[in-house]
């Protein structure tokens, strides 16, 4: 994590207890949201190790990391993500990569809307229904990368991209010729929200 001087002491004094196998690293440079993976990329730049990152405000199922690792073994030269989009789905630009097969998105047709309505909104499927390539990875679903996928340019983040690490990371992968493979081996949706309830409990343990 990266801490600014004004709140560094407070944060350090309130770090949670973690297992002995876990290290909490505090970096000198604040790279925005990308701080959760770029320092690891730099530290292990000369090693052939996988770096897995995610968001801290989500709940991940026990098999989440194993799925990313399994997908990486089948696609060793790709970044692996469980959530992602093509550029045309999230921007005004009608462009997408040419690598096939593309990840297939769920069709929000009448059948989809009826099922959502009948479940009173509780049925929330993943937006992708089949594995394939995407233009933009989405870190909240979990991502596996290798340090060799990046150059020093990844650390020179412009102001306009400082808060959009998914876009910046995906762009760096594209520049370096690395494809993004979205894996959809299991129909498990990453959950959020519960963390707000669990955080106070963790602090009391």
Give the residues covered by each predicted segment.
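Short beta-alpha junction loops
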Residues: 1-5, 85-87, 186-187
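Active-site-proximal specificity loops/subdomain of glycosyltransferases
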Residues: 2-49
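Short aromatic-enriched loop/helix-cap "lid" or pocket-rim segments at secondary-structure transitions
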Residues: 8-12, 91-95, 195
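Short beta-strand-to-loop acidic/aromatic patch adjacent to the donor-nucleotide binding site
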Residues: 47-59
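Short coil/turn segments at beta-strand junctions that form active-site/ligand-binding loops
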Residues: 47-49, 76, 178
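A conserved hydrophobic position in a structured secondary element of the catalytic/binding core
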Residues: 56, 145, 165
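Conserved catalytic core of nucleotide-sugar-dependent glycosyltransferases
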Residues: 59-157
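C-terminal catalytic/acceptor-binding lobe
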Residues: 156-205
């Amino acid at each position: 994590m990266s801490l600014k001087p004004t709140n560094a002491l407070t944060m350090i004094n309130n770090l949670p207890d973690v297992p002995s196998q876990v290290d909490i690293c505090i970096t000198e440079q604040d790279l925005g949201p990308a701080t959760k993976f770029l320092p690891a990329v730099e530290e292990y730049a000369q090693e052939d190790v996988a770096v897995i990152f995610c968001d801290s405000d989500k709940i991940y199922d026990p098999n989440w990391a194993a799925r990313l690792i399994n997908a990486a073994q089948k696609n060793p030269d790709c970044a692996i993500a469980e959530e992602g989009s093509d550029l045309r789905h999230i921007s005004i630009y009608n462009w997408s990569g040419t690598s096939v097969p593309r990840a297939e998105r769920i069709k929000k047709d009448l059948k989809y809307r009826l099922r959502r309505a009948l479940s009173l909104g509780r049925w929330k499927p993943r937006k992708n229904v089949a594995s394939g390539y995407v233009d933009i990875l989405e870190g909240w679903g979990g991502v596996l990368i290798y340090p060799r996928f990046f150059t020093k340019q990844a650390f020179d983040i412009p102001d306009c991209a400082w808060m959009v690490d998914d876009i910046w990371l995906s762009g760096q992968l594209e520049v370096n010729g690395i494809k993004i493979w979205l894996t959809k081996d299991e129909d498990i949706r990453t959950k959020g929200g519960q963390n707000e309830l669990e955080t106070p409990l963790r602090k009391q343990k």
